[in-house]
Amino acid sequence: MAQISLTFPDGKAREFPAGITPAEVAASISTSLGKKAISASVDGRHYDLQWPIETDAKIAIHTMADEAQALELIRHDLAHIMARAVQELWPDVKVTIGPVVANGWYYDFDRDETFTPEDLGAIEKRMKEIINAREAVKTELWERARAIAYYEERGEPFKVELVQAIPEDQSIRMYWHGGWQDLCRGPHLQHTGQVPADAFKLMSVAGAYWRGDSANKQLQRIYGVAFKTRDELKAYLHMLEEAAKRDHRKLGREMELFHLQEEAPGMVFWHPNGWQIYRTLEDYMRGRLRQAGYKEIRTPQVVDRKLWEASGHWEAYKENMFIVEVEEEHAKEKRINALKPMNCPCHVQVYNQGLKSYRDLPLRLAEFGSCHRYESSGSMHGLMRVRGFVQDDAHIFCTEDQIESECAAFIELLSSVYKDLGFDSFEIKLSTRPEVRIGSDEAWDKVETALENAIRKVGAAYEIDPGEGAFYGPKLDFKLTDAIGRKWQCGTFQVDPNLPTRLGAEYIGEDGAKHRPYMLHRAILGSFERFIGILIENYAGKLPFWLAPRQVVVASIVSDADPYVAEVVAALRARGVRAEADTRNEKINYKVREHSVGKVPVILAIGMQEVEARSVSVRRLGETRTESMGLDQVVDQLAADARIPG
């Protein structure tokens, strides 16, 4: 029998018969590993324990201790178990697809009746019965004709269509347990009992079109979440409850920050309070960029298609652009313009004005650029996903040798900004060269090394995402962690030698010859709209004092105190504090409660005692106790708190 060589993570290699399965490999190492094994990685591919290995390969055996692989298998198996449970409860239901998604899975079903909350409970119960039965999960390769005949016989048109879409020279892999079969690439666990029965929950039902096309039949999508332990599930459900309380759409109404409406889908109507947050954040970012050596510019929002064709965006991005046709005098054809979906081609136009020398580099151009992208109506979500937004966008034009230092400076700036805004931890992911790419391996080596050196220079941790860079260069993605543990991808740093070439950007080098600069696309917030949504949810509306739209409300207890209230408000405003008076004929407790709902950080209550002592009674948001302070003292303190960081 032919032999193959399998190399393990420790670098040691062993000979095995060709066709051996990972399950057999695990058992050959130790009885314990044979029992604990759930899957393998073979040459980087996630591999079922039942699949044969025919050639030399690198292999790693996975157990439940391997978080990523374990969760993928648990969630994938639950998709199958749920689909089986649904068809056992309602045999007429047709099945389609059921992939793993973030935190869980979904499966799409064709059913005439709508799934109810009671139905979800019945499905969960049947799923737990299947899990507790510890039924073996088996797999087999079928010929295409056999798979089509199998699904046609059972009246499963969606599965027939899926099989027919698979190339004719490929075999069809089937998985089954308890007599229920599904078309699937795998891998899966070895028996249903390996799925934790107390660590999953069916969450919701939503509509979904077959293959995502609104021209096709509408299906019902059941979502589920799953984890390795019951405690992890409880923690996740608690996080969802907390997230619901912090929902920026709900708080946006309570704090009178913004609204959206059908006449302008995906476009934000900022109210005075929300616009104040926006402007304060913009002023903060403008100051930080100025300190870091950026020059602010402004470019047009409506640009002729010729520029988008030259940049390559027209071909690749046209479907997501807002097109504007204009009839101009004496023109034979209509002029076709587009609202810019990104700022980079316009920034190259600014760079191209006037001859540049190597002495002018690095040149850092920043813009709070207004962009528009056509997002599908189903994908829009409050401030988090909109069609009209403003980026804290900047592009650095530099030489290859300057990439490392510019990247390091950017990471330090980003880290400082996030810290000022209340985010002390973030993750960095380095996406490296894809298979299809431009440029030489030597050029990619230099740039990827420059980014890694920059990250190490600032002492940050990072992970590599192999093959996920753009076709023209590697990139860094920055994910911050909020107060309830959610991760948000906001910052980016993208190396681009392509756009300067397409749009003719040049500089004169030390050798007197013309060279192409590198263009570094970078953002810290991403978009103001989305980042403000993140801030609102991170702080549950209780924004830092300097960022709060209404920083202080000075409330009278009796009408005789109104003149002193006006004096206090004037003193605070003179020192840059956003202060308002509340002299309505309402009880002080009512005023305090109302302004607390509006998330005002400080309420100063004033009665005759405070008038006579020229003091104020200070109540801070979230606290029940009050503190008496002299007028000059409270003005000095609040003026200091109101200063924008940096």
UniProtKB/Swiss-Prot annotation:
Its cofactor is Zn(2+). It comes from the Bacteria. This is Threonine--tRNA ligase. GO terms for molecular function: ATP binding; metal ion binding; threonine-tRNA ligase activity; tRNA binding. Zn(2+) binds at C344, H395, H521. Binds 1 zinc ion per subunit. GO terms for biological process: threonyl-tRNA aminoacylation. It comes from Cereibacter sphaeroides (strain KD131 / KCTC 12085). It is found in: Cytoplasm. The keyword NAD does not apply.
